[in-house]
From Swiss-Prot:
Protein known as: Pistil-specific extensin-like protein
Native organism taxonomy: Eukaryota, Viridiplantae, Streptophyta, Embryophyta, Tracheophyta
Secretion signal, residue range per the UniProt entry: 1-23
Positions annotated as Sequence repeat: 69-73, 76-80, 83-87, 178-182
Sites carrying sugar chains: N310
One of the Pfam families matching this protein, by short name: Pollen_Ole_e_1
Tissue: Pistil (stigma and style tissue).
Region (4 X 5 AA repeats of S-P(4)): 69-182
Region annotation (Disordered) ranges: 56-109, 121-254
Keyword Signal: yes
Domain of life (superkingdom): Eukaryota
InterPro entries named among the record's database cross-references: Pistil_extensin
Ranges of Pro residues composition bias in the record: 60-94, 123-161, 168-224, 231-254
UniProt keywords, alphabetically: Glycoprotein, Repeat, Signal
Amino acid sequence: MAVIISSKVLLIQLFVLVLGSFSKLSHGELWLELPLPFDWPPAEIPLPDIPSPFDGPTFVLPPPSPLPSPPPPSPSPPPPSPSPPPPSTIPLIPPFTGGFLPPLPGSKLPDFAGLLPLIPNLPDVPPIGGGPPVNQPKPSSPSPLVKPPPPPPSPCKPSPPDQSAKQPPQPPPAKQPSPPPPPPPVKAPSPSPAKQPPPPPPPVKAPSPSPATQPPTKQPPPPPRAKKSPLLPPPPPVAYPPVMTPSPSPAAEPPIIAPFPSPPANPPLIPRRPAPPVVKPLPPLGKPPIVSGLVYCKSCNSYGVPTLLNASLLQGAVVKLICYGKKTMVQWATTDNKGEFRIMPKSLTTADVGKCKVYLVKSPNPNCNVPTNFNGGKSGGLLKPLLPPKQPITPAVVPVQPPMSDLYGVGPFIFEASSKMPCDKN
């Protein structure tokens, strides 16, 4: 049972060693400063003797030689890459078929005292068949770290570069890839392995002779710069009056007509007052016109005198009305017992009144039958408008209506006796 546990511990230590080698490679050249597990002194661990299944020679792996530190960068060409370390001889190991790895014949178990600090403290593992747990051995104090000696400085110093001929900067030397770490040995190393001396420094090449110095070439003078005109300040902005946008005219909306309220079902009964008497409006003046006038008869005593002295009204005298317009109109009239005549033209309008005249035609009295030209009895008398009668000051209950037509007057006209007729002076 103890052999199975020790084999498990050995496998765990080998796994930790492989992980440590990969972590050192991932962190650059840190492995150069830390000691390798092969440099630690061996420690003896009492283990029971295990019969080896086969006998064979014992192979010892030499420790890897440390790589030389890279030289400082210089303008000289990069040094040649260091020679790779000699290949290590790896013993032939039979294939692992299961169980634990048996040691080689004639070899001793490796010293695990130096590897114990790299292994975490594992808890007590109880055996498979039962029983108290087997305690692992406590690690011993590690040995002090041994740093490799630094490489000796190169005896030849590079000469300073030529200042006249400037060379382009050399690229930084490429780091050589570190060789992969050797696989973990199966057998323990010898108690005092011999360290190989560091390789000799690479040869330093002498600097190449500087080329012949050429006379410095003079560069042509730069062309004169054109004088820039002084920058004038920008003119002040012109203050334009604000543009007033015309307000949109209100849309001509049709007037909203409120609907008439519907009449109630049973409207209230409102007593009606008696309507006042309707008074017919007065007819307009000028429809139809009426022409009136008087006719007189003058005695022989006042012959040739154009007055109404000693004149009397003449009944039965004939007069005529002649209107000159689009259509000529002639109407006749006879005086009454008061010597007055009235003519009512049928188709006469107010506009045609100024184109009408009245003439004397004949007299019924043979002693007074000569018409005179008094007021145009012979040449025609013009119509003159007459004013309607005035209303009384205290009107009666029923007002007096004005005449229904326009009144026009002519004359008066006079008939006289003939001059051949003897006149009685009595």
